[in-house]
A protein has these predicted regions:
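A conserved acidic beta->alpha catalytic loop
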Residues: 23, 37-46, 93
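Glycine-rich, basic loop-to-helix element that forms the pyrophosphate-binding segment
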Residues: 64-81
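Short aromatic/hydrophobic "clamp" motif used to bind/position activated sugar donors
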Residues: 86
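Conserved donor NDP-sugar-binding/catalytic core segment of glycosyltransferases
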Residues: 98-141
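Short, flexible, basic/aromatic active-site loop/helix in glycosyltransferases
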Residues: 135-165
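A short, conserved alpha-helix in the catalytic core of glycosyltransferases
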Residues: 167-183, 190-217
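Non-catalytic, C-terminal membrane-associated alpha-helical segments of glycosyltransferases
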Residues: 236-248, 252, 256-298
Length: 298
């Protein structure tokens, strides 16, 4: 029974979307794909409609007349879904053939409301082909080696032995649609929407959802010229400002839950200051080693 709608928000990345598009068309559990074009100027909507003509899965296109941002785009997609589950894709992420089926199976086995597999960076120096999708063997990790609550970050490429409860996961997640009756993506997050995913998963956990990370399947995040335009790209200085602003908002919003569920101590402001000082020290080291560059928000 097809029970999943895939939602793919995108902005001015039709080249990357075309590269990963075949990976979204091979999942028997998927009933429909919805592409949310968030005000693109590169002909994204028209091109996706062309791709839809040969897709084995029905494809809908939601077109925003202007760029509303990632949280609004996600919720636009959710409103179009009618299936029990939704899964968020991205315009520069390639799914393994078993990604949807494995997540659906393990969600049912664990009672998960939300679950995501591993995500591995795929370096694409020129044109994309599947030889770029490299996932070498690596040791199994414990959950406490994956999640770093001192930075609200995680190492989602790491392997774990099976589904593990997660305080937060990355965006390529399978989510029961009824979760959105209690929790929504917060449209306060703007710019590159840094932290909007973490915000959603913390809120979902606080509302009683069961959130899991699993090592049983994988997807690949393309990095290189193919994804060097569009998306949520911002320059480094602006990114660092957003890292401070958005992290402060996140921690103030979720501090009572984080203290109760994860034993964080002190104040949200104190945590944020310590985090940001460590972050800037790391940035100075990086700049000294490799120079100044722009970056992406994800």
């Amino acid at each position: 029974m097809t029970s999943i709608t895939i939602l793919i928000p995108t902005f001015n990345r039709i080249r990357a979307l075309e590269a990963v598009w075949p990976s979204y068309l091979v999942h028997p559990d998927v009933q429909r794909i919805v592409v949310i074009d968030d005000g693109s100027t590169d002909g994204t909507s028209d091109r996706v409609r062309e791709l839809a003509k040969t897709s084995p899965i029905p494809v809908d296109v939601v077109t925003h007349e202007k760029q509303w941002g990632q949280p609004e785009s996600r919720m636009s997609g959710v409103k179009k879904a009618t299936t029990e589950w939704v899964m968020f894709g991205e315009d520069d992420v390639w799914l393994a053939p078993d990604y949807c089926s494995t997540l659906l199976r393990e969600a049912k086995e664990t009672g998960a409301s939300i679950i995501a597999g591993r995500i591995v960076t795929a370096r694409v120096p020129g044109e994309f082909d599947e030889s770029c999708l490299v996932d070498p063997p690596s040791p199994l990790r414990n959950a406490n080696e994956v999640f770093d609550l001192d930075s609200m970050d995680a190492r989602f490429a790491e392997r774990v032995s099976g589904p593990v409860p997660a305080p937060y996961i990355h965006s390529i997640a399978l989510i029961r649609r009824d979760v959105f009756s209690k929790v929504k993506f917060d449209t306060w997050y703007s710019g590159n929407s840094w932290r909007e995913e973490t915000d959603f998963y913390l809120a979902a956990n606080a509302a009683g959802a069961k959130v899991y990370f699993t090592g049983s399947t994988v997807c690949f995040h393309l990095r290189g010229p193919i994804s060097a335009i569009g998306g949520q790209r911002v320059n480094r200085l602006w990114f660092e400002y957003l890292a401070w602003r958005n992290t402060r908002y996140l921690m103030n919003k979720h501090w009572p839950y984080l203290k109760r569920a994860h034993g964080l101590r002190g104040t949200a402001t104190g945590w944020t200051i310590r985090y940001y000082l460590r972050r800037q020290a790391d940035q100075i080291k990086r700049i000294a080693q490799s120079g100044f560059r722009s970056t992406y928000g994800s």
